[in-house]
């Protein structure tokens, strides 16, 4: 007897109808549409792709070889792509795929203490990065209504800057100067000084040699600041596309922390290499060159990056992003295209003079050509009373110094003013990796302005500054509290500092003991 003999015709019909219903209501496979293009040209760092008519500007593409690229030029039947990997891996006729995404990088506290590339991939030996999320590198700058006034100082630990060219949290202050004038050293010392605060740091090296980046990492390790820093490196040996996107990636990481209410310091070292990378890519893509062969939108490229910095309101986290972009000049030419662009975008500049370098004046900050347009409002009131007299004293000294070169006979008053100015300028010298607290800066500058260093030579002034710094830390707790409370310095406080410095320097007045 067959099994079918036990199934009635009615049951069979019911089962058959149920099977048909399941087919009609079940999921049916749908075709997957994949848009592809073809590589028609390859150059160093760029590729030309045909097809992909629906690709969007700044969209991330993937080549069949695994290399990624970004759409930079959109033309009928032709896409200009900047490569984020070695162009040697790409060949003519290779297939290119759309991702319908933009370039994104990991964000979060897991990046602190790590060395990464422009895509957020680890370059150290600490293993993979467990990031919280990925954010696109391009973002709209916060509106005016989402910003607040810059009202808090960023302490660099450098006397010449904190006293005369103060920087505020949320400010964009340009560091500008020729090669080998100490631009990166100022950036490193500023990061190291944040060990006294809660500011997080991001160092973005664009076009720097590997040994230069290694020195920065070593300095941060020695200063116990690496665990609160992110070091991003996009060297000259890598694809120029990575150098182009690196500052935007660093800013995206900073925006994550500022949205959590934290203060972030971002160093772009340096924007000259960034501009050159963008010029190289633009020329290879046959974009019309402009002044100094830079493309016409180079100002916008830098402005849209730096406008993302600022002091933000509580509605978007209440944090801040302070940027210190570095730019290199040629023979002190401040009127070159990229330097003038960045000077007009930023809130001030710290100019490092080659003439001061030749005089062994480090940091070689030229106070006459340096300015902070908003930082003075955020400067500590205790230091504010010193900064005005400091600038006047140095400017008068430089005028007299030029006059004295003619060999004119000088009277006693002029010689005294020259001695005072020379002592004050020497007092502004500061060794690398030796950041000073606000109290130490105040004590040293007041001692110099009051003429306590006038009779010393350069070596003795260095020793005298160390004595004054130590004495201030031990005896001026009241003044330190005034600095913390952001109070104005009183006459009695000024006298207290002078007396403390005089007592510390009295060791130079003691006769040497004769030990036989």
Swiss-Prot record:
Keywords: ATP synthesis, ATP-binding, Cell inner membrane, Cell membrane, CF(1), Hydrogen ion transport, Ion transport, Membrane, Nucleotide-binding, Translocase, Transport
Catalyses which reaction(s): ATP + H2O + 4 H(+)(in) = ADP + phosphate + 5 H(+)(out)
Binding locations of ATP: 177-184
Location (main, coarse): membrane
CC annotations in GO: plasma membrane; proton-transporting ATP synthase complex
Top enzyme category: translocase
Disulfide-linked positions: none
EC nos: 7.1.2.2
GO molecular function, one term: ADP binding
Membrane-related topology note: Peripheral membrane protein
Subcellular location, record wording: Cell inner membrane
Entry keyword Cell cycle: no
Chain positions of site Required for activity: 370
UniProt xrefs under PANTHER family: ATP SYNTHASE SUBUNIT ALPHA, MITOCHONDRIAL
Functional summary from the UniProt entry: Produces ATP from ADP in the presence of a proton gradient across the membrane. The alpha chain is a regulatory subunit.
Subunit structure: F-type ATPases have 2 components, CF(1) - the catalytic core - and CF(0) - the membrane proton channel. CF(1) has five subunits: alpha(3), beta(3), gamma(1), delta(1), epsilon(1). CF(0) has three main subunits: a(1), b(2) and c(9-12). The alpha and beta chains form an alternating ring which encloses part of the gamma chain. CF(1) is attached to CF(0) by a central stalk formed by the gamma and epsilon chains, while a peripheral stalk is formed by the delta and b chains.
Similarity annotation: Belongs to the ATPase alpha/beta chains family.
Protein name: ATP synthase subunit alpha 2
Native organism: Nitrosomonas eutropha (strain DSM 101675 / C91 / Nm57)
Lineage: Bacteria, Pseudomonadati, Pseudomonadota, Betaproteobacteria, Nitrosomonadales
């Amino acid at each position: 007897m067959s099994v079918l003999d036990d199934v009635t015709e009615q049951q069979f019909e019911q089962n058959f109808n149920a099977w048909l219903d399941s087919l009609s209501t079940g999921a049916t496979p749908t075709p997957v549409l994949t848009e592809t293009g073809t590589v028609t040209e390859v150059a160093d760092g760029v590729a030309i792709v045909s097809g992909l008519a629906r690709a969007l500007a700044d969209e991330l593409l993937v080549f069949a070889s695994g290399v990624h690229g970004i759409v930079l030029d959109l033309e009928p039947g032709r896409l200009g792509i900047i490569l984020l990997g070695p162009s040697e891996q790409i060949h003519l006729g290779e297939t290119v795929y759309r991702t319908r995404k933009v370039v994104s990088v990991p964000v979060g506290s897991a990046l602190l203490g790590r060395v990464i590339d422009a895509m957020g991939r680890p370059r150290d030996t600490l293993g993979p990065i467990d990031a919280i999320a990925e954010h696109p590198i391009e973002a709209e700058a916060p509106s005016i209504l989402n910003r607040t006034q810059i009202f808090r100082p960023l302490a660099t630990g450098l006397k010449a800057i904190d006293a005369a060219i103060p920087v505020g949290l949320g400010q964009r202050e340009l560091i500008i100067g020729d090669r080998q004038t100490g631009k990166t050293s100022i950036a490193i010392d500023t990061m190291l000084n944040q060990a006294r605060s809660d500011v997080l740091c991001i160092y973005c090296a664009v076009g720097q040699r590997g040994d230069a980046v290694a020195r920065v990492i070593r300095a941060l390790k020695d200063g116990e600041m690496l665990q609160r820093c992110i070091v991003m490196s996009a060297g000259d040996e890598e694809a120029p596309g990575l150098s182009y996107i690196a500052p935007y990636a660093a800013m995206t990481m900073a925006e994550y922390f500022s949205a959590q209410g934290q203060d972030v310091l971002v160093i772009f070292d340096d924007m000259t290499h960034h501009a050159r990378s963008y010029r190289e890519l633009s020329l290879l893509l046959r974009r019309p060159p402009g002044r100094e062969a830079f493309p016409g939108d180079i100002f916008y490229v830098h402005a849209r990056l730096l406008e993302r910095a600022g002091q933000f309101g509580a509605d978007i986290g209440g944090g801040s992003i302070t940027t210190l972009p570095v730019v290199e000049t040629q023979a002190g030419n401040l009127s070159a295209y990229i330097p003038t662009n960045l000077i007009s975008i930023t809130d001030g500049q710290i100019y490092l003079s080659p003439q001061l370098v030749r005089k062994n004046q480090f940091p070689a900050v030229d106070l006459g050509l340096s300015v902070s347009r908003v930082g003075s409002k955020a400067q500590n009131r205790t230091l504010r009373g010193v900064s005005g007299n400091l600038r006047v004293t140095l400017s008068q000294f430089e005028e007299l110094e030029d006059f004295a070169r003619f060999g004119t006979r000088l009277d006693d008053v002029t010689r005294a003013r020259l001695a005072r100015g020379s002592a004050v300028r020497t007092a502004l010298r500061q060794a690398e990796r030796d950041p000073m607290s606000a109290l130490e800066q105040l004590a040293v500058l007041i001692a110099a302005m009051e003429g306590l260093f006038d009779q010393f030579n350069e070596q003795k002034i260095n020793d005298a500054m160390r004595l004054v710094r130590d004495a201030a830390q031990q005896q001026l707790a009241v003044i330190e509290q005034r600095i913390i409370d952001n109070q104005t310095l009183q006459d009695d406080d000024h006298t207290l500092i002078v007396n403390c410095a005089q007592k510390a320097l009295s060791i130079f007045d003691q006769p040497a003991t004769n030990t036989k």
